[in-house]
Amino acid sequence: MPIDTATKQKIIAEYATKEGDTGSPEVQVALLTHRINQLTEHLKEHKHDHHSRRGLLLLVGRRRRLLQYVAKKDINRYRRLIERLGLRR
């Protein structure tokens, strides 16, 4: 499920560290979190959609690796990010 352009731009603007920032780990994690939330809602309705479930697991793994990278580089930045996203860690 792709993210529509308006939503994507809003997320990028909210989590960007500077103007024109689309690739920072914060932005990437925020976009992945949005996609994960969408897929989670989809799977609540379509419980037997195993292809989407695998995609969800891949997205969660990618987000976990990015969060580990941020935590390794700057622990305060990591804590702010998970607090803003409402992730439980």
Curated annotation (Swiss-Prot):
What SUPFAM superfamilies does the entry give? Answer: S15/NS1 RNA-binding domain
| Gene3D superfamilies given in the database record | 6.10.250.3130, S15/NS1, RNA-binding
Matches recorded under InterPro entries:
Ribosomal_uS15, Ribosomal_uS15_bac-type, uS15_NS1_RNA-bd_sf
Signal peptide as annotated in the record:
none
Describe its partners and assembly state: Part of the 30S ribosomal subunit. Forms a bridge to the 50S subunit in the 70S ribosome, contacting the 23S rRNA.
Report the function annotation for this chain.
Answer: One of the primary rRNA binding proteins, it binds directly to 16S rRNA where it helps nucleate assembly of the platform of the 30S subunit by binding and bridging several RNA helices of the 16S rRNA. Forms an intersubunit bridge (bridge B4) with the 23S rRNA of the 50S subunit in the ribosome.
Name of this chain's protein: Small ribosomal subunit protein uS15
Q: Which organism is it from?
A: Thermobifida fusca (strain YX)
